[in-house]
């Protein structure tokens, strides 16, 4: 007897509440074993001896975990020793108490309901210490504690937890506001909990909750906006409280007072609430049970599970409010796969039908119906998921024959809520409901609506109401043929294209969708009318019918699946549902490490599993085993990524940087970085699946390598850590894509996710992926679209310091040619970066003939500035004069010639004259020289007409004799004479004013051995005759330009040309 008594005493746990029939599970044994081991090690030792011994012991991973759990056990079970133990653990912990926080998080999530009263109170004390000392990841413990603060529960135990968490949040408000996701979870949870605390005995707690919540909402409203439509639904239930009533008025009528970026209630209603917030309002145990019901219970066998659930969670009057939370969770989180749709598992609509029909509280019943149809009210087929509206139509469709009262009340509610939900914007609500019904018919969720809308089991008033609201759906479409009523044995099945695999337990602020509105104090309301009053909609009658086993048996064969329908992107259930799946026996080599990873979900266990998994050949797995491993690992990798702030807030602080790459996915990158050997096929399959299901993996890898190399180099300055592009190539190979395509896609996604991190990584990208990134127009466009003036400045600094090279000379012209279609601001930024690279003009000058004044003003502006710093050369002038002249001239060419004339007049005149003369060779005066084979006259070499056109437009710009010196030089004179003599009558007439600047050809031939008028003599540079001739010519040119203002350029007469020529001839004779 004594032995039996001692055995029973030994079984009693200080941490967990155990009955005589309870057996210890692995978690309980692990905690108590660690406590006993720690006691044996430190028993009888002084503080100094204990610290020395433990400091050596914690160097081993296994002992470190045991010691951490042992200390945690003491702090949770012994209030008197807790402060000293906390000091001890801070001295010996080598991971910043990460092990303790991880185990405490798991303990709260899995075993909170079994903790003793002392342990619960010590948990609050320990949380307060963690928050006070800023222990990393304590927000995970807080979030799991918030989940344990259940709705619909006013027991003293639950109220103690709620008030304790509230006190921590109030005391450490600054710490709370530093974590936006925790702010969102806290506000969402307390707005929901305040609804349950209407009892006068709880008035002091309720007032404290209201004061804190309202203050947090108003001060951090920019963090509250992502809570979206379901936050509005919760606000509706507390709108009668004065503080919330004033908040409602500000949201509706003065939104800018809350936040300058907030545009009103519709902005919230267009945002889909993250699944994680919907999840946080269910107890973890309740979530596991409802997920098990929806994934493992066969249709027809569910009654005993429903009865147990009803007795467990709906036993008190306050618990009815839980039904709305459950329905929103089922609709938005539990999206069954195709395999489940094909099976005889109980469908979602049947569970929701049971939750609504078994509700005996009219207020909770109205709220439950609103939860069912909530996503209908603002449904947008282009954005929203049909799986969120499917249960509503199916529960009505399948109930119409045997439970018409269920269908009738739901139809009546849908008709009334469409009209009265938001009176001011009834048209928009109606569009959302119409979109829902239209997509339901298109996707064949049900064959047609006539069996439901025109059922003889509906009363006349309801049929009239349906006719008024859904007239468009009453006439059957021609292609549907005869009306089909749902059978009691089989119904039309469907496969729907669901959302791509999204992060189930994380915020989805980048993927926001539309929905609908509200519920207050248990009564459905219309938000506002013109008098700013809240109008009430009468609630429905209590529903008495329930879903019986008989009906379920008749409807057991529910889904007939079209095998040709593509539905590979089904959204999996949440992680808790995976725990309910039967375990698969795995090879001994990975069984232990895989189980450790699944339970702990950290980088250390993940890398240990990878080390065991990588060398295994394909023969080590059956197909189902490999699929089991891959599906679980991919899901865990996604779920353990942070929902917000995935990147470090600081680019210099080592703690922030290290924390940002501490998640299991980064463990994969670290493993690949440190292990270069070739992988076996199973590992390659795993890598491919990760790449497919986690699209962000590419840019997260780039981010990891930047930080990892930075941190490792700081730790060991003797060794250089390289940015290994081979790892990125592995990822690209696993995704079966070219590295260039992957890089551009990943950088595009990264820029949209976080512009600062994208620009931070940019120098590394251009350095490590030089062959792909340099002169890459697509990457350049991604960069230019996101930068502002400060970013341009930083890029220029990096280029000037040699840290960043965006362009190389070879091929640059093609890059700039493609950039001509960019936006104006982007092009101006581009030209600044080009200029910072000191690109010589010769590399891009071939673009000059292609640029058009109307289409490419940015490029022409920059080219003009470049030309001002260049001397005119034969090549540049050739390209400029190859530009196609317009009827009104080319201001670009004219501007360039004008400023060159100020410094290089003679040189410019000689170059143009030489170019013009080359068109009229002396050997063939009547034929123009043909261009070399393969060179286009119009683009490479300017034609004579192009040169003359540009000279003519330049002449017109030279008013009052300014800039006319270009034409007085000897070579230009001879070139114009040659052009005149070789031109036809049409050309001579067109350029008559230009040709008038040169003497006629016969005046240039004298009797002194062909020495022409005005030519320089070989032996005398300052010949008097030449000086006189130049002076006379200059005066003549000035006379021509002066007379040009008073005469029409188009009406030059032949007689005027002759008179001018005679005056020039007389002047020449006088000079001779």
Swiss-Prot record:
Q: Which UniProt keywords apply?
A: Cytoplasm, Nucleus, Phosphoprotein
Domain of life, per UniProt, equals Eukaryota
Q: Which residues carry this modification: Phosphoserine?
A: 1042-1043, 1047-1048
Q: Membrane-spanning residues where? A: none
Intracellular or extracellular location(s): Nucleus; Cytoplasm
Q: Name one GO cellular component term.
A: nucleus
The record's section on InterPro entries has:
HEAT_Ints3_C, INTS3, INTS3_N
Q: Which Pfam families match?
A: HEAT_Ints3_C, Ints3_N
List the residue ranges of the region (Disordered).
920-941, 1002-1072
Q: How does it assemble?
A: Belongs to the multiprotein complex Integrator, at least composed of IntS1, IntS2, IntS3, IntS4, omd/IntS5, IntS6, defl/IntS7, IntS8, IntS9, IntS10, IntS11, IntS12, asun/IntS13, IntS14 and IntS15. The core complex associates with protein phosphatase 2A subunits mts/PP2A and Pp2A-29B, to form the Integrator-PP2A (INTAC) complex.
Q: Which family does it belong to?
A: Belongs to the Integrator subunit 3 family.
What this protein is reported to do is described as: Component of the integrator complex, a multiprotein complex that terminates RNA polymerase II (Pol II) transcription in the promoter-proximal region of genes. The integrator complex provides a quality checkpoint during transcription elongation by driving premature transcription termination of transcripts that are unfavorably configured for transcriptional elongation: the complex terminates transcription by (1) catalyzing dephosphorylation of the C-terminal domain (CTD) of Pol II subunit Polr2A/Rbp1 and Spt5, and (2) degrading the exiting nascent RNA transcript via endonuclease activity.
Q: What is this protein called?
A: Integrator complex subunit 3 homolog
Organism (species) = Drosophila erecta
Q: What is the lineage of its organism?
A: Eukaryota, Metazoa, Ecdysozoa, Arthropoda, Hexapoda
